[in-house]
Structure formats: C-alpha cells, structure tokens
C-alpha cells in the first residue's frame, strides 16, 4: 500500500459518504491499515462533523464559505476543534468575503484564517499554527524540517 491520505469532495451526499467512510474505515482497520484524509470544502452542520469525526483520522477543509454572511458553517466551526481543521481554497470558486464573486486564489486564505479565529475566540496566528501542524501530520511532512526561505505569516497581508 502507499499509505496516502484521501481527499473527499462530496456535495449533497454526506449521509451516503458517512456510510461509505464508516465501511471503508472498518475494512482498513481489519487489514491493519489506517484510513485518513481531508473532507474538502466541508460546509455541513455540527452533527455531520461529529459523525465524520468518529470515522477515522480525517481533517475538515474549511474554505471561503465560512465568511459568508448566511453560512451555517460559522456555527459548525464554533464547535469544531482546531486539531480537526485545515485551511483551503476551492479555487477558482467559493471566494471569501470581501472578494466574493471574483476568482478565488490561495492569497485569500488569511480571510478564512481570520474568520475562524474570530469564531473560535483565538488569534489568527494560533489558527495558522494549528492548521499547519494538522496538514503536516496528515500529509506526513517532517515537522522538524524547516525551509530556508523567509515566509511571511499568513495574517500579515491583511
């Protein structure tokens, strides 16, 4: 096996996806394997989050929907643990406020980070640190490896 995480993109089929993930997680465990991955563009309710959280080692990709004024995702994010989140875009779609209606790009990640921080009552730096740790863990990056480039904080551009 390659022991790689999966990226799951589901629309309007979360109940079916929950059943599938539960079945596949059980099958993987029976073989001594670990099913893990990311639920891309997650924008569901807290009940769906809790159900999927029990299914295995999955992260929840939070993107440009969270800043939308009528997004139910804001209520869900308040209940989610930072250790379960990664920041993402759905480029070129789901552009966060204040750029909604324009082409999405990774440069808008700070808006998502800031909104999550506000919802969680923490700092953008803490959200950025937690979601970076989560991504490094999920994708097997060596946490001790440091780049030689001086990268700015994801919140500095705002």
Describe each model-derived feature in a short phrase.
Residues 6-8, 37-40, 60-62, 85-89:
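Hydrophobic faces of well-ordered beta-strands that scaffold small-molecule active sites
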Residues 71:
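Conserved catalytic/ligand-binding micro-motifs in nucleotide and anionic cofactor chemistry
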Residues 97-99, 113-114:
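Crotonase-superfamily enoyl-CoA hydratase/isomerase domain that binds
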Residues 107-158:
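Mid-to-C-terminal alpha-helical segments outside catalytic/metal-binding sites
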Residues 43, 64-68, 91-93:
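Short, acidic/turn-prone active-site loops that include or flank metal/cofactor-
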Residues 26, 57-58, 82-85, 144:
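Generic structural signal for secondary-structure transition and capping sites
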Residues 1-55, 67, 75-80, 98-107, ...:
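Divalent metal-binding pocket/active-site signature
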Residues 79-91, 96:
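Glycine/small-residue-rich hydrophobic helix-like segments
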């Amino acid at each position: 096996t390659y022991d790689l995480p999966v990226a799951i993109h589901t629309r309007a089929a979360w109940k079916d996806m929950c059943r599938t993930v539960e079945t596949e997680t059980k099958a993987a465990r029976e073989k001594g394997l670990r099913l893990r991955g990311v639920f891309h563009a997650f924008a569901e309710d807290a009940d769906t989050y809790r159900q999927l959280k029990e299914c295995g080692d999955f992260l929840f990709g939070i993107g440009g929907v969270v800043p939308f004024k009528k997004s139910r995702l804001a209520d869900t994010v308040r209940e989610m643990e930072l250790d379960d989140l990664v920041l993402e875009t759905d480029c070129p779609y789901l552009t966060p406020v204040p750029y909604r209606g324009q082409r999405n790009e990774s440069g808008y990640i700070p808006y998502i980070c800031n909104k999550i921080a506000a919802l969680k009552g923490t700092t953008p730096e803490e959200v950025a640190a937690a979601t970076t740790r989560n991504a490094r863990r999920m994708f097997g990056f060596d946490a001790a490896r440091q780049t030689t480039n001086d990268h700015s904080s994801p919140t500095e551009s705002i």
